[in-house]
Structures are given as C-alpha cells and as structure tokens.
Amino acid sequence: MSSSEDEDDKFLYGSDSELALPSSKRSRDDEADAGASSNPDIVKRQKFDSPVEETPATARDDRSDEDIYSDSSDDDSDSDLEVIISLGPDPTRLDAKLLDSYSTAATSSSKDVISVATDVSNTITKTSDERLITEGEANQGVTATTVKATESDGNVPKAMTGSIDLDKEGIFDSVGITTIDPEVLKEKPWRQPGANLSDYFNYGFNEFTWMEYLHRQEKLQQDYNPRRILMGLLSLQQQGKLNSANDTDSNLGNIIDNNNNVNNANMSNLNSNMGNSMSGTPNPPAPPMHPSFPPLPMFGSFPPFPMPGMMPPMNQQPNQNQNQNSK
C-alpha cells in the first residue's frame, strides 16, 4: 500500500530527484555562461555563430498594436481640454492671500460707492423738492399780488408775446429795407467771392429779383387808392350798375316803353288806313312790327294779351275775380 501511494504521489507531484535536476542544470548553464564571459574569444564566437532570434509575427503585431494604442492615448490626453471650475480661491497657490485681500477690498469699495450714490441721490431729490416747493410758493405769492393789483387798478393783464415782430419791416441804418436801393449802397458784400446770398436775401431772393419785387410793390401801392376805389363804387351804385336786380328792372322798363311806343304807332296807322279806305285813296304799306310785340287781334275778337310785366286791362280784372269766386 505504501508503495502504491508513493508511486501515485510521484506521478502526481513528482519525486525529489526530478525536482533537483533543473536546479543542477541551471547551475551548470550559469557556470558555462560565466566561463564564456570571462573568455573574450568565446564571446566573439558566440556572437558570430549564434543565429539571430526572430520574433514571431503575432508578437510583432501585438507590440505594434500596443505602441499605436499608447501613442493614440498620449495624443488624446494632449488634445483633451481640461476645464477647472473653482468655487473659491485655491489655497495651494502662493498668492491666495493676496487675491483674497483684493477681492474683499473690491467688494467693500463697490458697496461704499453704491451707498454713497444712493445717499447723494436722496439728498438731491430732497433739495430739489424743497426748492420746487419754495419756488412754487413764491410764484403763487407773486401771482396773487399781481392779480390783486390788476383787480384794484381795473387793468386786465396782457398775454406775454415775443420780442421779435415778424410782420414789421426790417430796418438797416434806421431806414426800411424796402426803401433802400441796393445799387446805392457802397459796399455790396453779397457780390464778394464765396459769399452766401442767404445771409443777405431771404426767401430765395437775389439782387435782381429783390429789385423787381420792390418795383412791383411800389406800383401796387401807387395803384391802390382807397378813396378812388370808394368813389368808383359810389358812381356805379348811382348809375344802377352795381346790383344785378337793378339791371334786370331797368331792362324790363325799357322793353315796356318800347312796346307802348309800337302799340301807339300801330293804332295811329290803323286809323289812318281806315280814313284812307273810306276816302278811296290807297293805303301805304304798314311798317314792320317789333318782334317782341304779339300779333294784332281781329275785330270782334278777344282783347290783346298783356305783355309780361304789364298790368292787365281794367275790364278784365272783374271777370277774373268772378271766375276765381266761382271756382
């Protein structure tokens, strides 16, 4: 039993003699290497005679992959941006204390400036309000006194107007500009080179247009005579040519007079014709009748129609009144 167990142990774990062999081999190899290293000729022979150890392709590929990965990792680490957000001063820095002192001084100065500004603004507003109140009271007092003075004097205060009168004629050397002839002036600065005409003539005038304007104004003033205009109006009114109603009435009156004259002439001609017919003498031709005169009625017929604007005959008025009453 013991032998079988020993054999099993040798098979599984190995014997002591087998374990000691590699150590002996290693010691011999080490001794050989030491002897070769001590002899230089042996070392040279080993260098020239020993074949070059070739590394397998898989090992090369593994090494190249590792080198590429290490290089890419280095590049990535260089290209990455590192952002550091600090919530406070870094105590590891040497100038941390100086930075703390600067920050505290800046915050304190800003607070002082803000407080000073608010205090100044408050004082300014208070002083301005007080001044406005005092000025308002003073103005009220002045206006009250002026109103009382005007009421006592009975004079109504006039509205304030500007000091410049735009309608007033301009004056040059105590003479109106419309009465000055530019040709008479010795100095004519607007003729100098580089002069601006708008400094001497307004509303786009120049020397020549201004002279024309002055002559036209002078002519209008001469033609405008209020007394002469009033006399002309009075003469027109006396002649009846001023109103259109007077003109129509005068024209109607002239027409009526002409018609009456024509009627009288026709009646006289009719009587003469009757006398001539009875005496046997030939009748002369009757004169032409006025175009506005209606034709003469026949004997025994109705009386002639009245002309427009004339009174009807007296014998027709009672008949018309009777007809109106019957209606």
From Swiss-Prot:
Localization, UniProt: Nucleus
Example of a GO cellular component annotation carried by this entry: nucleus
Protein's GO biological process: mRNA processing; termination of RNA polymerase II transcription, poly(A)-coupled
Domain of life: Eukaryota
Compositionally biased tracts (Acidic residues): 64-81
Pfam hit, one: Fip1
Key words, A-Z: mRNA processing, Nucleus, Phosphoprotein
GO MF assignments: protein-macromolecule adaptor activity
Biased composition (Low complexity): 312-327
Entry similarity comment: Belongs to the FIP1 family.
Function: Polymerase-regulating component of the cleavage and polyadenylation factor (CPF) complex, which plays a key role in polyadenylation-dependent pre-mRNA 3'-end formation and cooperates with cleavage factors including the CFIA complex and NAB4/CFIB. Pre-mRNA polyadenylation factor that directly interacts with poly(A) polymerase PAP1. This inhibits the extension of an oligo(A) primer by limiting access of the RNA substrate to the C-terminal RNA binding domain of PAP1. Seems to tether PAP1 to the cleavage factor I.
Domain notes: Circular dichroism measurements suggest that the protein is largely unstructured in the absence of interaction with PAP1.
Known partners and oligomeric status: Component of the cleavage and polyadenylation factor (CPF) complex, which is composed of PTI1, SYC1, SSU72, GLC7, MPE1, REF2, PFS2, PTA1, YSH1/BRR5, SWD2, CFT2/YDH1, YTH1, CFT1/YHH1, FIP1 and PAP1. In the CPF complex probably interacts directly with PAP1 and YTH1. Interacts with RNA14.
More about this protein: Present with 1310 molecules/cell in log phase SD medium.
Protein name, per record: Pre-mRNA polyadenylation factor FIP1
Organism: Saccharomyces cerevisiae (strain ATCC 204508 / S288c)
Gene that specifies this protein: FIP1
